[in-house]
Regions:
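Alpha-helical transmembrane segments of multi-pass membrane proteins
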Residues: 1-175
Length: 175
């Protein structure tokens, strides 16, 4: 989660205002610019969204292969490495595509922690699940240990994500 928060802050602040993981944000920016007639900006959002979709699609098939997880992890590492190696500027959209593709694979690889469904690249679902666990902890007296564990898991994930955002934002002048 730390890496996901850091990567979204990095791409938003240094790679043209595009999110690597939060495709909801990219969809919002895409359609806002479409409605406002800013057609020259649409490519940077749509390419990231398409790359994310292709990453989800490819992981569906890769996981069925022998050694599929190793292949997926290798793709993530290679795509992150190449994405960071691309100079800032006109090719930001290519770096963002690589990051979005890799993030999609990451999202597909890690779906649960200790039987709790998680999103490892974004916070909205984890925040919802945290509040559900807090509510259930208060109302469901018989299963408090289970909900306490959920509170710890979701709080840790959210804290890691926002810490990644904070670190990149604080270091942005040095990157």
């Amino acid at each position: 989660m730390f890496v996901s928060g850091a990567l979204d802050a990095y791409t938003l602040l240094l790679r043209g205002g595009v999110f690597a993981a939060m495709q909801t944000g990219n969809l919002i920016y895409f359609f806002m610019n479409l409605v406002q007639g800013n057609f020259s900006l649409l490519y940077k959002y749509i390419f990231s969204i398409i790359a994310f979709c292709l990453g989800i699609f490819s992981e569906h098939f890769t996981r069925r292969c022998k050694g599929g997880t190793k292949i997926s992890v290798a793709v993530i590492v290679v795509f992150y490495t190449v994405g960071f190696a691309i100079p800032y500027g006109d090719l930001n959209f290519v770096a963002n595509m690589l990051f979005s593709f890799a993030v999609a694979i990451q999202l597909q690889l890690i779906r649960t922690v200790d039987s709790f469904a998680i999103a490892n690249t974004m916070c909205t679902g984890n925040l919802r699940s945290l509040i559900e666990c807090v509510s259930s902890f208060i109302t469901e007296k018989g299963e408090r240990a289970k909900y306490r564990r959920g509170i710890i898991i979701y709080s840790t994930l959210i804290l890691a994500f926002v810490t990644g955002v904070a670190v990149v934002t604080a270091l942005i002048h040095y990157i």
